Amino acid sequence: MLKSTPMKPNFTLSLSFDGIRLLHRTSGGWQLVGEVALDSADLAAELAVLRKTATALEPGGLRSLLLIPDAQIKYLAIDTAGMDPAARHAAAAEALEGATPYPVADLVFDVHADGAQSHVAAVARETLEEAEAFAVEHRFHPVSFAAAPAAEAFVGVPHFGMTQAASALLDPGETVTPEAEPIVISGVMSAPAGPIVDTDETTPVADTPVANTPVADTPVADTPVAEPDLV
């Protein structure tokens, strides 16, 4: 049996209606590499500059976590006192019935327990597909989905599973470990020294090992990290 190897992406591509940001995981937290406005006169060219900067920072390979904008996510808090994980899952699915324009079968949702309550974050599958298609088109090598909600909306980091592209981007046996702490920008990344060269970005092989990947300093409650409910 192939041994499972946990990994965390070395970049985050944050998508919003205001623009696109690329963050780099460092020992000091998430550093902003750059951002591009959606109304840019040449969006593709500016995104290419971001991508080339990323490959200069991590010559071994670029793999990214896609942050879905909050406007595309439905957050709920439900009473789950005394429930086990299976019962919380069922309660979340019931609460989502009619809460979005989509049938529950067309949603991906994550549930985090917080005392007598559970926090639910749900997103449409088609939203994830569109986000992945965009990231793949611009060669940001997306491997998983998450969100960065306001603290009052969700406890922890919503995780929406791995991308379709992940199987081709990850090494055999690698699995993406969900983020345990909120994804926040701790600083601005200095530009790499020297010219930025467009390296071969088709076969990323390097990632940031889980054991040596401090994330943002913002603490969160010690809640179990649940796998997303793919229903």
State where each predicted segment sits.
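Hydrophobic/aromatic-enriched cytosolic interaction surfaces used to assemble or bind macromolecules
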Residues: 1-231
